[in-house]
From Swiss-Prot:
Pfam families: Adaptin_N, Alpha_adaptinC2, B2-adapt-app_C
Gene3D superfamilies: 2.60.40.1150, Leucine-rich Repeat Variant, TATA-Binding Protein
Classification of source organism: Eukaryota, Metazoa, Chordata, Craniata, Vertebrata
Species of the source: Bos taurus
Protein's UniProt name: AP-1 complex subunit beta-1
Function: Subunit of clathrin-associated adaptor protein complex 1 that plays a role in protein sorting in the late-Golgi/trans-Golgi network (TGN) and/or endosomes. The AP complexes mediate both the recruitment of clathrin to membranes and the recognition of sorting signals within the cytosolic tails of transmembrane cargo molecules.
Residues bearing PTM N6-acetyllysine: 318
Length: 951
């Protein structure tokens, strides 16, 4: 009889009966009872009251019964930790059982019971099992160490289990080696800078020896570990590749992808002119092709990985394009991936085959697939110049089919072809215009409008065509509205006498009737350009456009290198780095391909080289955490040469001038928009006219954010340093408005505390504020909250919440903030300095090991020393004062009478600063050593230390 009978009972009083059966003297009865308990537990019934009775059943030699009891324990131990202690003695006893299966089962179960109270009892049995004579027990114990580390990392280190794991790498049994490697790899994920695996040529040799005899999953663990190793020279890299290459013919696709990952990384170290390099490239193709004969799901994963490989090394699969031709029964997700790879492999040699395939795909029934096929024809035209004419001809044939979505997609790609090959295929415009009425998608309408505007001089009725789009202007998408505005301005510049009324109509619609700030601003820019200098307008709007690139959807090179290091994992399927989708992944070690260094001796540690590579390859599209680091590595000047203006504290950058009325809803300079002639009077007198047509969008914060910001308490952290208020904008420079202020950090939020004083003879209203781009992306979270008029001689205090989600630009000095304030009188500009302590975040405390590894990892030339003079505080007071400002003391030592404080802090943009503060009792001068990856920040951190400790 099957076990399904255990799931069918619905009797009342079942728990009482089970309790009696669990205490029955007959083994078979007890076993049946435990099965019923497990069945009840499986369907969601609460059988926790039977805990003591089930635990009593542990005392048995029957392996099946033991497994069932252990399953029950794992499920209920967390909710009944005190009861779980009852089972400890049985576990310890089972760990010494003569049967190795029972020993392994006991140690595995103890590792799965995530209860702190039990972990301390687990140490002794685990230590014995790690040295057990049976390899099955040792391999199980190795995994248990990783589980224990997840519960209590400190205990694992204190008990020396990490050393025991390292010893297992030299074990005679390959599965023990594989599990030890897997456990160490997982532990090192949470300690990215600690060289736990200690990869050196001797250990690598042991791993390669074990590789041949492992199970398939053991091989994956070992291959993933090998991919983190950086060989000393190309000879060692070649030797490893030779021993890994046989894995390419493995039946398990995961093993194949792990082997491909190792070889792709080590290819970077091999000289490109060598015979072995070319032979290895040839060997990589067949296994990748074989992966495409599996299940659709396996094919999809393989194709996503192949997409990365083709972007990195297209020569591997350049002869295999036919493999990626779509089969009629492929699922849509496989079809789309194959199509993408086909385009990447398209070349002059195979373009005829590719185009024939694509034309066939464009007649299929699946709309998404057809769209992508039509788009692919356009990409072929752009990528392979010799095929452009044939591609255009194919697209025209498809347009003649009059299938709506095919026509629309074809028009979108023809626009790109016009951009790539100007003045070459414009003869087809007439055919395109015939299909104008059938266009209903924003992309297609925008593409057609762009074509009409760009080639208006060749189209007799261009004004009529654009006017037809203008009739439903407010119903169009933003993309179409912006394109139509630009197209009509182009038309006006080419045929001014015939289209004056049309351009005034579109400018009026864009600036007066639209709620979209982007559209309004572009309208004002064109309006001012046309009214002040039509010649310049022509040069700007009708300027020669840069040619579009061949591949617009390539993954950015640094990210591609990182994804190559994650072949075979979820990152390679998402095409995103792990830290983009793994929760709490800030500690995940970012991987990069090794740099070819010939035969020089670079350290064996994968950590050192990886970090160096990370520094040398700043991200092109940085995450918020890396923005400043990348800016500091680049020699960025200001974007424009700003002339100094004597009446201001800084070079006048037009933060608000170009579109303040439209952005903030007020009228400066008397009714802008009524006539282009008044455009010039809109520019503040202190701002050079050069900057007028460059408005910065106003910060629009959501109502929800506003509620959160306003709900934060006023109370500050005890002892948190606040710089005294300074006058930022004197009344003499702001027509009677005086602004003084400072910055504070309280309850995890940054505030700009300001005092507005009206020293003029008239009241002030309509206040608004905006920041220029700055080094830390600081912007207001909410609009300026001054809701009542500021009367003469009246003052008002304002607390403005800030965040660091704005655009970033390196300033000089680094903490400089340029501010524009507008009221009913004028727009005023001032600059102030942000004390960096308000940018210190609460999670700036590093673990000791991470601190030590990071300190060693940062180059010595990044270390800067400063003297803090005339400070009479002891080490504890210093530590306490700094902690109130989110500077955390990691460790304190006394060396030869000197107190040494080791501290860490973190800025809002993710930059870590490590500090060593030396305090000599009786000596009022302290020595501060600072280390960080962006040493330009250190000077400002020192200033903050000085201010905090002296106030």
């Amino acid at each position: 009889m099957t076990d399904s009978k255990y799931f069918t009972t619905n009797k009342k009083g079942e728990i009482f009966e089970l309790k009696a059966e669990l205490n029955n003297e007959k083994k078979e009865k007890r076993k049946e009872a435990v099965k019923k308990v497990i069945a009840a537990m499986t369907v969601g019934k609460d059988v926790s009251s039977l805990f003591p009775d089930v635990v009593n059943c542990m005392q048995t030699d029957n392996l099946e019964l033991k497994k069932l009891v252990y399953l029950y324990l794992m499920n209920y131990a967390k909710s009944q930790p005190d009861m779980a202690i009852m089972a400890v003695n049985s576990f310890v006893k089972d760990c010494e059982d003569p049967n190795p299966l029972i020993r392994a089962l006991a140690v595995r179960t103890m590792g799965c019971i995530r209860v702190d109270k039990i972990t301390e009892y687990l140490c002794e049995p685990l230590r014995k099992c790690l040295k057990d004579e049976d390899p099955y027990v040792r391999k199980t114990a190795a995994v248990c160490v990783a589980k224990l580390h997840d519960i209590n990392a400190q205990m694992v280190e204190d008990q020396g289990f990490l050393d025991s794991l390292r010893d297992l790498i030299a074990d005679s049994n390959p599965m023990v080696v594989a599990n030890a490697v897997a456990a160490l790899s997982e532990i090192s994920e949470s300690h990215p800078n600690s060289n736990l695996l200690d990869l050196n040529p001797q250990n690598i040799n042991k791993l390669l020896t074990a590789l041949n005899e492992c199970t398939e999953w053991g091989q994956i663990f070992i291959l993933d570990c090998l991919s983190n190793y950086n060989p000393k020279d190309d000879r060692e890299a070649q030797s490893i590749c030779e021993r890994v290459t046989p894995r390419l013919s493995h039946a398990n696709s995961a093993v194949v992808l792990s082997a491909v990952k190792v070889l792709m990384k080590f290819l970077e170290l091999l000289p490109k002119e060598s015979d072995y390099y070319n032979m290895l490239l040839k060997k990589l193709a067949p296994p990748l092709v074989t992966l495409l004969s599996g299940e659709p799901e396996v094919q999809y994963v393989a194709l996503r990985n192949i997409n990365l490989i083709v972007q990195k090394r297209p020569e591997i699969l350049k002869q295999e394009i036919k493999v990626f031709f779509v089969k009629y029964n492929d699922p849509i997700y496989v079809k789309l991936e194959k199509l993408d790879i086909m385009i990447r492999l398209a070349s002059q040699a195979n373009i005829a085959q590719v185009l024939a395939e694509l034309k066939e795909y464009a007649t299929e029934v699946d709309v998404d697939f057809v769209r992508k096929a039509v788009r692919a024809i356009g990409r072929c035209a752009i990528k392979v110049e010799q095929s452009a004419e044939r591609c255009v001809s194919t697209l025209l044939d498809l347009i003649q089919t009059k299938v709506n979505y095919v026509v629309q997609e074809a028009i979108v790609v023809i626009r790109d072809i016009f951009r790539k090959y100007p003045n070459k295929y414009e003869s087809i415009i007439a055919t395109l215009c015939e299909n104008l009425d059938s266009l209903d998608e924003p992309d297609a309408r925008a593409a057609m409008i762009w074509i009409v505007g760009e080639y208006a001089e060749r189209i007799d009725n261009a004004d009529e065509l654009l006017e037809s789009f203008l009739e439903g202007f407010h119903d169009e998408s933003t993309q179409v509205q912006l394109t139509l505005l630009t197209a009509i301005v182009k038309l006006f510049l080419k045929k001014p006498s015939e289209t004056q009324e049309l351009v005034q109509q579109v400018l009026s619609l864009a600036t007066q009737d639209s709620d979209n700030p982007d559209l309004r601003d572009r309208g004002y820019i064109y309006w001012r350009l046309l009214s002040t200098d039509p010649v310049t307008a022509k040069e700007v709007v009708l300027s020669e456009k840069p040619l579009i690139s061949e591949e617009t959807d390539l993954i950015e090179p640094t990210l591609l290198d990182e994804l190559i290091c994650h072949i075979g994992s979820l990152a390679s399927v998402y095409h995103k780095p792990p830290n983009a989708f793994v929760e709490g992944s800030h500690g995940i070690h970012r991987k990069h391909l090794p740099i070819h260094h010939g035969s020089t001796d670079a350290g064996d540690s994968p950590v050192g080289t990886t970090t160096a590579t990370n520094l040398e390859q700043p991200q092109v599209i940085p995450s918020q955490g890396d923005l400043l680091g990348d800016l500091l590595n680049l020699d960025l000047g200001p974007p424009v040469n700003v002339p100094q203006v004597s009446s201001m504290q800084m070079g006048a950058v037009d933060l608000l001038g170009g579109g303040l009325d439209s952005l903030l809803g007020s009228d400066l300079g008397g009714g802008i928009g009524g006539s282009p002639a008044v455009g010039q009077s809109f520019i503040p007198s202190s701002v050079p006219a050069t900057f007028a047509p460059s408005p910065t969008p106003a910060v629009v914060s959501s109502g929800l954010n506003d509620l959160f910001e306003l709900s934060t308490g006023i109370g500050m952290a005890p002892g948190g340093y606040v710089a005294p208020k300074a006058v930022w904008l004197p009344a003499v420079k702001a027509k009677g408005l005086e602004i003084s202020g400072t910055f504070t950090h309280r309850q995890g939020h940054i505030y700009m505390e300001m005092n507005f004083t009206n020293k003029a003879l008239q009241h002030m209203t309509d206040f608004a504020i905006q920041f220029n781009k700055n080094s830390f992306g600081v912007i207001p979270s909410t609009p300026l909250a001054i809701h009542t008029p500021l009367m003469p001689n009246q003052s008002i205090d304002v607390s403005l919440p800030l965040n660091t989600l704005g655009p970033v630009m390196k300033m000089e000095p680094l903490n400089n903030l340029q501010v524009a304030v507008k009221n009913n009188i004028d727009v005023f500009y001032f600059s102030c300095l942000i004390p960096l302590n308000v940018l210190f975040v609460e999670d700036g405390k590093m673990e000791r090991q991470v601190f030590l590894a990071t300190w060693k990892d940062i180059p010595n030339e990044n270390e800067l020393q400063f003297q803090i003079k005339e400070c009479h505080l002891n080490a504890d007071t210093v530590s306490s004062k700094l902690q109130n400002n989110n500077v955390y003391t990691i460790a304190k030592r006394n060396v030869e009478g000197q107190d040494m404080l080791y501290q860490s802090l973190k800025l809002t943009n993710g930059i870590w600063i490590l500090a060593e503060l030396r305090i000599q009792p009786g000596n009022p001068n302290y020595t501060l050593s600072l280390k960080c990856r962006a040493p330009e920040v250190s000077q400002y951190i020192y200033q903050v230390y000085d201010s905090i400790l002296k106030n």
